[in-house]
Amino acid sequence: LMVVTSNADRICTGITSSNSPHVVKTATQGEVNVTGVIPLTTTPTRSHFANLKGTQTRGKLCPNCFNCTDLDVALGRPKCMGNIPSAKVSVLHEVKPVTSGCFPIMHDRTKIRQLPNLLRGYENIRLSTSNVISAETAPGGPYKIGTSGSCPNVTNGSGFFETMAWAVPKNKTAMNPVTVEVPYICAKGEDQITVWGFHSDSETQMGRLYGDSNPQKFTSYANGVTTHYVSQIGGFPNQTEDEGLKQSGRIVVDYIVQKPEKPGTIVYQRGILLPQKVWCASGRSKVIKGSLPLIGEADCLHEKYGGLNKSKPYYTGEHAKAIGNCPIWVKTPLKLANGTKYRPPAKLLKERGFFGAIAGFLEGGWEGMIDGWHGYTSHGAHGVAVAADLKSTQEAINKITKNLNSLSELEVKNLQRLSGEMDGLHNEILELDEKVDDLRADTISSQIELAVLLSNEGIINSEDEHLLALERKLKKMLGPSAVDIGNGCFETKHKCNQTCLDRIAARTFSAGEFSLPTFDSLNITAASLNDDGLDNHTILLYYSTAASSLAVTLMIAIFIVYMVSRDNVSCSICL
């Protein structure tokens, strides 16, 4: 038997946090209240588009071509000639149908509006200095090169697109289809984008210009793609695109993409617009829908939110295409555990007693310390002292950082792998891109959520292990100078003020230094038996007599029960 009387101090281990618990999801325990969390998601707000940090970003194809659409630049409108800067990223800012301020074009008959987008997809773009075909002497000629007042040049004279030559035959006669080969004239490794087309008008104008008022046939072939056209005769109202003279005629414009060293062919009749200067393009530029102007810089360009600066690894909200150092879309907000399981003080006081409540309070939050720090606290006459254990805290931080980095690296790799596969597929099934992109996003989101659940499980278990290790170290340092009262707390045989606690945190504590006579120590006195005049023999006699009597009584009782059970003895009870 031991009697404990004390006026000593208590020292407890714990982890700091806010007083309010946080909830995280785990793989096997479901939702768990923890002492701290790291938010992993943010919900962005809409902003203007910007230049991507550290990356050449292209807005307009030709920034110095004023009052020109990107289609003007792509077709080589006389007043819209200029250099296209190199760029790793291009912003598709012309989302509505765009016209060209030149001769009226029948946009709906071809994919010509896609030409600027095609060019945006290249990092390096240049217009050839020489013509790919000698238009005057092409098959079916000789030709006179036509111009139009609807397409004024820099001196406001009649002009035409730099990428095409309007081949008006000198001999006004009908012509069977003829073929011209389009040679590859770009540098090795460049794709050649060759623009061509044809002109059609009323029967009267077709007869006057070409000597044939019948519909004409045209065919292009390059890179395994064949396209056929038949011209439409008449029925056009007088109009112009943006400026210049109104025209009753129309032009149909198309393009072919020629891979390195691969020629193309064009089969045509009257009204041909022969290829002239060609676009030579190389490298890849990522394209994203957006708007101009580009203001400032951003980590990420997002089709729905504009320019974003990454503050969290993941985001919730609208999913859309994004490029750059972007957060990854997830369905629901995610939190990473940054502490131990939360234990409410009131519950601990009821179930584990006063000292259990103290331990729970410490794990629930210490005032005056940064959230997430491991350390010690002492309670006594000096009040409350708190000291952080830097080594244990750093180990915990490293563990959480490792989980966070591993989580990020894992998902970035998955994103890159899935994106790469889907981008390749996208080239074959463009019409399914949005559905494929949604499927990709859902897949990645599910993987991220599972990874966070597993990480939370590991972090919570790891934090509990850190606290147990901290408790073992404290017990070893205190040695016989303290009594383990459970729940990470010890009652010391000496006072432990802030200096004492700092020594413990620094691992330089010496019990002898604080076990001075001036301190009130833990008084433990053995219980003693009072002497009432009885010696040891008398006590032993009393004990043996009582034991013998008890044994005899038990034997008699057992015998009576046995006899009654065999009907050898009857027992009657009378009142």
UniProtKB/Swiss-Prot annotation:
A lipid is attached at residues 571, 574 (S-palmitoyl cysteine). Glycans are attached at residues 33, 67, 153, 156, 171, 238, 309, 338, 497, 523, 536. Binds to sialic acid-containing receptors on the cell surface, bringing about the attachment of the virus particle to the cell. Plays a major role in the determination of host range restriction and virulence. Class I viral fusion protein. Responsible for penetration of the virus into the cell cytoplasm by mediating the fusion of the membrane of the endocytosed virus particle with the endosomal membrane. Low pH in endosomes induce an irreversible conformational change in HA2, releasing the fusion hydrophobic peptide. Several trimers are required to form a competent fusion pore. SUPFAM superfamilies: Influenza hemagglutinin (stalk) (SSF58064), Viral protein domain (SSF49818). HAMAP family: INFV_HEMA (MF_04072). Residues 565-575 are cytoplasmic. The chain crosses the membrane at residues 544-564. One of its GO terms (cellular component) is virion membrane. Pfam families: Hemagglutinin. It is a single-pass type I membrane protein. Homotrimer of disulfide-linked HA1-HA2. GO terms for biological process: endocytosis involved in viral entry into host cell; fusion of virus membrane with host endosome membrane; fusion of virus membrane with host plasma membrane; virion attachment to host cell. InterPro entries: Capsid_hemagglutn, Hemagglutn_HA1_a/b_dom_sf, Hemagglutn_influenz_A/B, Hemagglutn_influenz_B. This is Hemagglutinin. Belongs to the influenza viruses hemagglutinin family. It is found in: Virion membrane; Host apical cell membrane. Palmitoylated. In natural infection, inactive HA is matured into HA1 and HA2 outside the cell by one or more trypsin-like, arginine-specific endoprotease secreted by the bronchial epithelial cells. One identified protease that may be involved in this process is secreted in lungs by club cells. GO terms for molecular function: host cell surface receptor binding. The keyword Plastid does not apply. The record marks 352-353 as: Cleavage. It comes from Influenza B virus (strain B/Bonn/1943). Disulfide bonds join 12-489, 68-80, 102-151, 496-500. Residues 1-543 are extracellular. Major glycoprotein, comprises over 80% of the envelope proteins present in virus particle.
